[in-house]
């Protein structure tokens, strides 16, 4: 074989790997484009409305349980409660939605922990892509099923939402864990092995920002189409369910390209290889006759691996700082959206169409925030990643502060419908920037080879706060029957996060993560 032929073969292999790396990034964009409408449109707008609507239809007046909630008998100011478990307990109709959110996130956390260890153990990008598609199909079909329920099936509504949200949690963790792998694969292929570490930071930020913008773009398209669907069903009880149906179909269809796009750039070591199974087994000696781990051990590996990762995270100062800060931030930012929807419906009596318009405003400005904040504002003013996060939090804290003003003033402080439209713009900018920056920051400070497990920690921190936040707001609403009091809770949390974020040093965190990855036992590294 001639020297020229060998060069041609090497060039062909290099081009093949570059194409694979580029396709993986396109597949990552498809993940964001297909699934983002579920959380932005369904979870943030439609599901809260459906839960409150079903609760109101099946609820009664708080002061007289013999009077249906939607009855014209009694005062308009009478609050409503929903009887659960054969009327053993009664909860505020707004609180019911919040309690379901908490329960769904608890289920999501359990399934995320179980699955994240499996994908790290398997060590194949293609397998992770299949996980995205499998759970996406189940989540999409559960969303479609929600659109077919009648208003008496309140427990079925809660159950299907819990399943769909659990599936979204899995693909969110696995999808985010693929980002640093795709970035490094792309740089390795383009530079044929060697690349500058600083390029990882910039490329991660760019791809993360584009992914967030694409996700919000898809959510915007879904919301605009949903406006026409809801308008065509105006006056019907099924108007929101038509929008939910469209979200489910969108999720199902647009995730399919990932089947062909996401693949291994290099041939991975097979997960069922006896050496890999032996090296990675959390239970040495418990492989089957073929040297393979059984599914019981695969599932438990996620919990064992997570426990080990928390032990390692204690050695990573900046990972711990970020996770503590994120727990506080997420508790406020994620809960405030669903609370605002319930507040708008219950207190301001806004129509479904108006709430979708607010959601569209939020999505448009989230796209701007995801694109402008990391790529222009942070660059222009030379903010560090941690500084950028702090400025976003300060910006976002105005929203609950403005809601608090409603206790003291009658003219403003979320007393009128138009104020919700203005705050939607404000919230969207902060949400988009936070989504793009937080993902890229955390991906920079996790040990190479442990992306899925550490992003599982990130998700668990996020979801742990999302279990607590809605639950506490639900208790507060049950006690006061006034959801406005939740704004005190949100404002306090955002203020508490600032001094924690001020301690974050991304460069130090990245250095410590790389050092830790070098000293991890061979059995705990991903075998590339």
Swiss-Prot record:
The modification Phosphoserine is found at residue 278. InterPro entries: Atg22, Atg22-like, ATG22/LtaA_families, MFS_trans_sf. Its main location: membrane. One of its GO terms (biological process) is amino acid transmembrane export from vacuole. It is a multi-pass membrane protein. Keywords: Amino-acid transport, Autophagy, Membrane, Phosphoprotein, Transmembrane, Transmembrane helix, Transport, Vacuole. Residues 1-98, 152-153, 232-241, 340-352, 410-417, 507-528 are cytoplasmic. The chain crosses the membrane at residues 99-119, 131-151, 154-174, 211-231, 242-262, 319-339, 353-373, 389-409, 418-438, 486-506. One of its GO terms (cellular component) is vacuolar membrane. Disulfide bonds: none annotated. It is found in: Vacuole membrane. It comes from the Eukaryota. Residues 120-130, 175-210, 263-318, 374-388, 439-485 are vacuolar. It holds the Pfam family ATG22. Gene3D superfamilies: MFS general substrate transporter like domains (1.20.1250.20). Vacuolar effluxer which mediate the efflux of amino acids resulting from autophagic degradation. The release of autophagic amino acids allows the maintenance of protein synthesis and viability during nitrogen starvation. Belongs to the ATG22 family. PANTHER family: AUTOPHAGY-RELATED PROTEIN 22. This is Autophagy-related protein 22. It comes from Saccharomyces cerevisiae (strain YJM789).
